[in-house]
């Protein structure tokens, strides 16, 4: 069972429909016990970083997500949800994030239209489980005005928008997509299927303990 975190700022409906399409068992929840009982977690998000962190704090979900991140349970952040995984953001004000990944969220300063909205090429950097069946230089769908300034060793996918945008990051059980896999057609569905596979593998490992 995959828990989609509902904290009032997520693209819940599209993520829910995508998981339904790939046949993944899921629950939309903000209940701490349901999140801990899940086999994997998706943190979606659309909106401002400081507001999102305030809401997560109010719902006591910061601690929950940090505990999930520090375990081996698979965690996938999408768009703003990916940004929240980092140490802090410069959006509106300096604001601390979940600190599950090293790096700072900075505003895009490019000679192009902001937000970066639409399809862009994603170049793979290295290999991870979520790349299975995903061709290099596939096109994915973005909507964002901020990007992650982070170490190269956690970057597994890059798009060019006047600056190198980390499109996909990963460290251990933690994954983050700056783009929207649920809106990225067959490529996005394949990545979500791969995440489902990672979740199932983790679940099987727990049953054997």
Swiss-Prot record:
InterPro entries, sorted: Class_I_gatase-like (IPR029062), GATASE (IPR017926), Imidazole-glycPsynth_HisH (IPR010139)
Catalytic activity of the protein: 5-[(5-phospho-1-deoxy-D-ribulos-1-ylimino)methylamino]-1-(5-phospho-beta-D-ribosyl)imidazole-4-carboxamide + L-glutamine = D-erythro-1-(imidazol-4-yl)glycerol 3-phosphate + 5-amino-1-(5-phospho-beta-D-ribosyl)imidazole-4-carboxamide + L-glutamate + H(+); L-glutamine + H2O = L-glutamate + NH4(+)
Location within or outside the cell: Cytoplasm
Pathway membership: Amino-acid biosynthesis; L-histidine biosynthesis; L-histidine from 5-phospho-alpha-D-ribose 1-diphosphate: step 5/9
UniProt keyword Amino-acid biosynthesis, yes or no: yes
GO molecular function: glutaminase activity; imidazoleglycerol-phosphate synthase activity; lyase activity
Source domain of life: Bacteria
EC number of the protein: 4.3.2.10, 3.5.1.2
Keywords: Amino-acid biosynthesis, Cytoplasm, Glutamine amidotransferase, Histidine biosynthesis, Hydrolase, Lyase
CC annotations in GO: cytoplasm
TM stretches of this protein: none
Main location per the UniProt record: cytoplasm
Known partners and oligomeric status: Heterodimer of HisH and HisF.
PANTHER family in the record: IMIDAZOLE GLYCEROL PHOSPHATE SYNTHASE SUBUNIT HISH
Designated name of the protein: Imidazole glycerol phosphate synthase subunit HisH
Organism per entry: Bacillus thuringiensis subsp. konkukian (strain 97-27)
């Amino acid at each position: 069972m995959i828990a989609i975190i509902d904290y009032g700022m997520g693209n819940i409906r599209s993520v829910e429909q995508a998981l339904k399409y790939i046949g993944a068992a899921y629950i939309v929840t903000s209940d701490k016990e349901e999140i801990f009982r899940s086999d994997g977690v998706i943190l979606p998000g659309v909106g401002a970083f400081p507001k999102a962190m305030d809401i997560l704090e109010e719902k006591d979900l910061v601690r929950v997500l940090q505990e999930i991140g520090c375990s081996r349970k698979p965690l996938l952040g999408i768009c703003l949800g990916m940004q929240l995984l980092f140490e802090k953001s410069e959006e509106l004000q300096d604001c601390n994030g979940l600190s599950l990944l090293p790096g700072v969220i900075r505003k895009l300063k490019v000679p192009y239209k902001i937000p970066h909205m639409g399809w862009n090429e994603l170049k793979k950097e290295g290999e991870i489980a979520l790349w299975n069946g995903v061709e290099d230089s596939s096109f994915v769908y973005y909507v964002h005005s901020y990007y992650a300034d982070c170490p190269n060793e956690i970057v597994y996918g890059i798009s060019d928008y006047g600056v190198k945008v980390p499109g996909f990051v990963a460290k251990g059980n933690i994954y983050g997509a700056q783009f929207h896999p649920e809106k990225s057609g067959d490529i996005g569905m394949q990545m979500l299927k791969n995440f489902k596979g990672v979740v199932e593998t983790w679940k099987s490992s727990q049953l054997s303990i």
